[in-house]
């Protein structure tokens, strides 16, 4: 028995020695530099809006509503939104320039703890060639993350995701917008939401983007434009209330 143990020890010693002198199969020839950046100033750039909503939520106390509207300036600058959707009771938690990234960061304030019968989501600012812009696939991934959070908190509440709108101001993003819209429409059943296409009413019979439905900045909708949006979105919300 002692001889067997000595033999096993000898074999193990040889194997260990070979392992110590063996040539590694993977060799790292270069060091990849890692630069850590602090995105806090960017992600919290609209803290004034968030602080306002935090105070508003405490003031309201009753956070029940027929529809919770979430999103960026196209929702925030909708001056007639409460009149347009009357008699539905709305709560709006939007701010100009919002992206899905800071909406995820501010989720607890703008989206959690409410009692909506339905939710409407519109946000378009993640795309772009600017410093903080992302491509269409990344934008869609951010949508999926935000939608997943909503579905976790409101599993039985109808969620309506509105398509990204075309505009002359963001004409360079049109291809990416179309791709994101196609992915959102295709993903609707899998994630359990309803996709609402508002782009179809924004073109004339010749297929040209209408200019009479935008403000002078050629980016945001004017009153006529919001009438078109209301005509498409409101029936969905009215049907939920029934």
Segments predicted by a language model, with ranges:
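Oxyanion-hole/transition-state-stabilizing segment in secreted/luminal serine hydrolases
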Residues: 75-91, 102-140, 164-168
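N-terminal secretory targeting modules
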Residues: 1-67, 83, 241-242
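Conserved beta-strand elements of the Class I
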Residues: 68-70, 91
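Generic structural signal for well-ordered alpha-helices
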Residues: 107, 143-148, 181
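Conserved beta-strand segments of alpha/beta enzyme cores
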Residues: 89-91, 158, 192-194
């Amino acid at each position: 028995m002692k001889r067997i143990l000595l033999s096993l020890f000898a074999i193990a010693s040889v194997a260990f020695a070979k392992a110590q002198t063996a040539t590694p199969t993977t060799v790292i020839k270069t060091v990849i530099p890692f630069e850590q950046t602090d995105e806090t100033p960017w992600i919290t750039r609209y803290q004034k809006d968030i602080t306002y909503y935090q105070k508003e939520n405490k003031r309201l106390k009753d956070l029940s509503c027929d529809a919770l509207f979430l999103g960026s300036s196209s929702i925030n600058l909708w001056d007639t939104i409460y009149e347009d959707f009357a008699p539905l009771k709305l709560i709006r938690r939007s701010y100009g320039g919002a992206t899905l990234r800071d909406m995820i960061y501010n989720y607890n304030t703008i989206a959690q703890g409410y009692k909506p019968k339905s939710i409407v989501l519109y946000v378009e600012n993640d795309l772009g060639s600017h410093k903080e812009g992302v491509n269409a696939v990344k934008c869609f991934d951010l949508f999926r993350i935000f939608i997943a959070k909503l579905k976790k908190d409101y599993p039985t509440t109808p969620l309506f995701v509105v398509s990204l709108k075309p505009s002359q101001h963001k004409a360079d993003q049109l291809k990416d917008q179309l791709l994101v819209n196609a992915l959102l429409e295709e993903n609707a059943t899998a994630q359990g939401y309803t996709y609402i296409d508002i782009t179809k009413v924004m073109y004339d019979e010749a297929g040209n983007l209408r200019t009479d439905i935008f403000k002078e900045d050629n980016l945001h909708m004017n009153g006529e434009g919001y009438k078109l949006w209301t005509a498409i979105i409101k029936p969905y919300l009215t049907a939920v209330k029934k």
